[in-house]
């Protein structure tokens, strides 16, 4: 896994322009009508969050080959989710659970406000469509408070097909595109 020797790797243009446009519209529309899907786990803000969304689970499946190329590993997809962050949102410093052994966090789009992610103390600013592949269980990652209006981010998670966490395939769900 030399490709992730620092624990992370920036992948420019992880999403195409068409994927950015599609996911921007999709996440903003779902956010506007959301009344039930909020996450208080990694942020104090209670931002819109969708686990196992069919759109991002499909993206995770379609980006597996790219992730294998970027990491040098054979990967099994586990789950995806996306969040729409708002003013004063943050991401608490943490490491991930076993189903997030190899992950990529991807900036879909935002209001334009800068909001870096920190990987093991290194500040990384992503442009729309860029991603950071990282060893989710090994490297601490976080974000400070967001000072913009909106920021759409997706997270695609995988495990090493030949590693100790392969039991987490599909995050132990019977199908992709559903919650547990």
Locations of the language-model features?
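Non-heme Fe(II)/2-oxoglutarate
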Residues: 1-71
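A structural signal for short, well-ordered beta-strand segments and their strand-loop junctions
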Residues: 10-11, 76-77, 133-134, 155
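A short coil-to-beta-strand element that immediately follows conserved catalytic motifs
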Residues: 72-81
């Amino acid at each position: 896994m030399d490709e992730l020797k620092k624990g992370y790797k920036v992948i420019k243009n992880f999403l195409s322009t068409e994927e950015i446009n599609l996911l921007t519209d999709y996440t903003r529309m779902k956010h506007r009508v959301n009344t039930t899907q909020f996450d208080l786990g990694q942020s104090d803000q209670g931002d819109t969050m969708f686990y196992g969304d069919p759109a991002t689970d499909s993206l995770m499946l379609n980006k597996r080959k790219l992730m294998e190329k970027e990491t040098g590993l054979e990967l099994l997809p586990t789950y995806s989710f996306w969040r729409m962050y708002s003013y004063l949102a943050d991401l608490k410093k943490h490491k991930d659970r076993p189903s997030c052994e190899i992950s990529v966090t991807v900036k879909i789009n935002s209001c334009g406000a800068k909001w870096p992610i920190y990987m093991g103390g290194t500040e990384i600013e992503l442009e729309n469509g860029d991603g950071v592949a990282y060893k989710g269980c090994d490297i601490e990652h976080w974000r400070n408070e967001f000072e913009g209006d909106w920021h759409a981010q997706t997270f695609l998670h995988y495990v090493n097909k030949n590693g100790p966490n392969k039991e987490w395939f599909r995050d132990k769900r019977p199908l992709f595109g559903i919650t547990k």
